[in-house]
Amino acid sequence: VNGYGTSNAARANPDVYFVHASGDGVLAGTAPANVANVMGRMEYGKMIAGCAAALQSETGNISYLGPLIDAETRRLVNSTYLGAKYCWTEVRGKPIEELNFKVTWIGFWFNIPGVTLDPTQVANDFINGGSDVIISGIDTTEALVEANKATAAGKKVFAIPYDYEAACEQAPEVCLGVPYFNWGPTYFELISAAQAGTFEQRWDWIAPDWSDINNPETSIVGFQKGAGLTAENAATLDNFIAMLADGSLNLYTGPLNYQDGTPFVAEGAVADDTTIWYTEQLLEGIEGQSAP
């Protein structure tokens, strides 16, 4: 469970309000009344990223540059894979056997020399292994940088960075887009509640503003399409986003199995929030570690 440190600090300071983004102490029932947990549903941003990758890939070899391994990062990788799988098979009509989706975890959200794997080396390993799209789950842009170098050297490689709205500006021609968090609206609401004396304990997992996922005033999660995405694929991606928005497409519909064959979502069932939040493994079809 995330949030023991926050909960302990909150108990020691009952007159102070605490906000733990990404935490789940409230969900688990371990947080005191002066704690709020909030998180954006980045799963949607990653589904969009996965779809963009599958639409643009010529080889079907898509790689994911992962940070550390926990429930959050597992569900983000799974969401990326589900988006890629849908757009590869249902939109492009290609066999699932031709989609190769691999994750390598570096061990943290950015490179720490001597501690993590080197994301530059991992990105190059992906490229040398035949991947033509690298999706980043780390906070820095090594995937984009190395895709750009490879493309300049004659290979066509695209990348999808993470969590910085303007990341594509570093190498626009190879950037398919970027999913990102926008915490401003939620923090404004929480601070306003604290000032008004109406702050309440809450665990909120907040969806994008589907009327405009890139509205900085309202949407906690966005996706900026990149210049590397063809016009046709960009239009197709917009249709995919619209299906997520209106609920006509729910990628967490069963049957879905974990890597070891354990049922994750039964046939005909739809995963609830708690099931997704506490994701225990990567999904069947993904190559890579589910646990450290």
Regions found by a protein language model. Give the residues of each.
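A residue-level marker of the well-folded mature domains of exported/periplasmic proteins
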Residues: 1-292
